[in-house]
Each structure stands twice: as C-alpha cells, then as structure tokens.
Amino acid sequence: MRLRRKAWARPELESDPKVIYNPMHYKENWQEAFGNNHPVHLELGCGRGQFINQCAELNPHINYIAIDLYDEVLVKALRKINEKALHNVRVIPMNIAKLESIFKHDQIEKIYINFCNPWPSRRHHHKRLTHPQFLSVYKKLMKDHSEIWFKTDDDELFKDSLKYFAEAGFIEKYRTFDLHQSEFTENIKTEYEEKFSNQGVKIKFGIFVVNKGRQN
C-alpha cells in the first residue's frame, strides 16, 4: 500500500511526545519511555490504530508500542490515542526491519502482526513479516514463552506462515482458518478485518509461542 504524502502529517507527529523519533535512546530501558516497568507489547504495522487503541484501553497495565512506516496512518492512530487520553501507548515511525536497533534481547512479551502485506511473488517472500529471517529477530527480542498473535485474510500467507513459525522453532498454541466462527473470545478487530469480514472473507489467526530451547 502506497499512500499519498500529506505535508501536515509529520509536523503533527513531531509535536506529540508520545511519538518517538529516537527509539534507540530507549533500547536498554523502555520503562523510561513509559515511566513504569509494565510489560511491553508491540504491534508491527499498526495502520490507523483501531486495534492498538482498544488493546491499550482494555489493558492499562500493559505498555504498547505501535510501529508503522507511514506518517499518514500514524497520525490517525495518534489522534485515536489522544481522543481516549491513553497514556500506555507510544508510536514509532520506522521500518520494521530495524527492530534490533531499538530493542535488546528478552524485552518484548507479545507481538501482534495484523494483516501485513502478503507479498505473493516468491521473489518477495523474504519481505513478509512472518518470514523466518524476521522471526529469528523477533525470537531474540522476545522473552521466552512469550507469544506472537498473527492475523491475515490471505490463505497462502497463512499456510506459508505456519511453516515459517515451525521452522523458526515456535510452538503453535492455537490456529483457526475462520476466526469469527471460532471459539476464540479475545479477538479485537482491526479496520481491515472489519472490511474483509463484511465482504465474506474468512480471517485466519494463529498464536505462536517463543521457545528458546528449541533450535531453528
């Protein structure tokens, strides 16, 4: 998805202290960014922020970090944060490929990957956020026995990702090929999820557990 650049977006982000442009400063101590030592959960590709905002509102004792590359969607996420006066969310405008530069090992307790680009062409598979090269990074940055929650509308991406997680040494805790008809009760919908579901598209979902004792 390519977005038309909005000249007003960057100044609005830069004027808000909840938006972090120097995340490397907090690499050793993300508690400093929040002013507490609550667990850190991370959403990779937060889009317009409906999901992360509802998570933060329901779980005030968890610190949420929302990452996206596009200022235009981050502004919309930030506005939702401010409308609800949420103090447990921070926003980082950056490329997800740079995660290792801003987090130390064993720091993150949960990662959410919602409706990422499926990159259907085989020559682009390495760009998928569930590709083994990304999973190996997440695994280092996450605490042992922590979880990745992954949702997608794309059948091929989901099937391939099941293999990716297994190859990377994650333990599959839960999977469904039709989330909205499943027994899973903790789901929070994203904007894309509502759109796809209204079109009759089945949502695929899985929970994968970090096992640092299992070699990939």
UniProtKB/Swiss-Prot annotation:
Q: What Enzyme Commission number does this protein have?
A: 2.1.1.33
The entry's S-adenosyl-L-methionine-binding residues are: E43, D68, N95, N117
Which pathway features in its UniProt record?
Answer: tRNA modification; N(7)-methylguanine-tRNA biosynthesis
Could you tell me which CDD domains the record lists for this protein? Answer: AdoMet_MTases
Task: List the molecular function annotations (GO) for this entry.
Answer: tRNA (guanine(46)-N7)-methyltransferase activity
Q: Which Gene3D superfamilies match?
A: Vaccinia Virus protein VP39
InterPro entries, from UniProt? SAM-dependent_MTases_sf, tRNA_(Gua-N-7)_MeTrfase_Trmb, tRNA_methyltr_TrmB_bact
Task: Give the SUPFAM superfamilies listed for this entry.
Answer: S-adenosyl-L-methionine-dependent methyltransferases (SSF53335)
Would you name any one GO CC term? Answer: tRNA methyltransferase complex
Task: Identify the keywords attached in UniProt to this record, alphabetized.
Answer: Methyltransferase, S-adenosyl-L-methionine, Transferase, tRNA processing
Quote the catalytic activity from the record: guanosine(46) in tRNA + S-adenosyl-L-methionine = N(7)-methylguanosine(46) in tRNA + S-adenosyl-L-homocysteine
Q: Which residues bind substrate?
A: D153, T190, E191, Y192, E193
Query: Could you name the domain of life of the organism this protein comes from?
Result: Bacteria
Provide an example Pfam family for this protein.
Methyltransf_4
HAMAP family xrefs: tRNA_methyltr_TrmB (MF_01057)
Question: What is this protein's function per UniProt?
Answer: Catalyzes the formation of N(7)-methylguanine at position 46 (m7G46) in tRNA.
The family line of this record is: Belongs to the class I-like SAM-binding methyltransferase superfamily. TrmB family.
* Name assigned to this protein: tRNA (guanine-N(7)-)-methyltransferase
